[in-house]
């Protein structure tokens, strides 16, 4: 599991007094930085390969300014050229949002998906998603 703590900013708060719903996709992307680092250790954007093809965000509770949030990211599935990420956002210990993101290892020059290299696949497996019952036993919920 990857974990990122984010301090909500005043500018991310909307007129209803909570964090605007357009902010969460940006936060979830920020939490994926360690995964991007696996695919792009030198951060060479000319050879970027991680292309998002789907993101499904479910809001569970409102999120507020003034209290840090914690985003936890797991690898849910690894295909030949794609991976599915499971992401959860917590504030004060409460689950506030769940996101699932699908990425493809895509070669922008050839415009084709490429197989995820074995060394990256092995590293991703270290962060594999456990089902909710096992996570509760481990104190992650």
PLM feature segments, named:
Residues 1-70, 76-141:
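Terminal targeting signals and extreme-terminal segments of soluble enzymes
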């Amino acid at each position: 599991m990857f974990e990122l703590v984010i301090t909500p900013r005043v500018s991310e708060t909307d007129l209803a007094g909570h964090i605007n719903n357009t902010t969460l996709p940006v936060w979830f992307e920020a939490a994926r930085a360690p995964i991007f680092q696996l695919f792009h250790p030198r951060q060479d954007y000319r050879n970027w390969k991680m292309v998002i093809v789907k993101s499904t965000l479910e809001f569970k509770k409102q999120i507020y300014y003034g209290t840090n949030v914690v985003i936890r990211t797991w690898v849910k599935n690894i295909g030949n050229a794609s991976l599915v990420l499971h992401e959860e956002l917590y504030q004060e210990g409460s689950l506030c949002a769940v996101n699932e993101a699908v990425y493809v290892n895509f070669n922008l020059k050839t415009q084709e998906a490429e197989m995820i290299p074995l060394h990256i696949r092995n590293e991703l497996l270290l962060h594999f998603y456990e089902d909710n019952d096992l996570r509760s036993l481990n104190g992650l919920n």
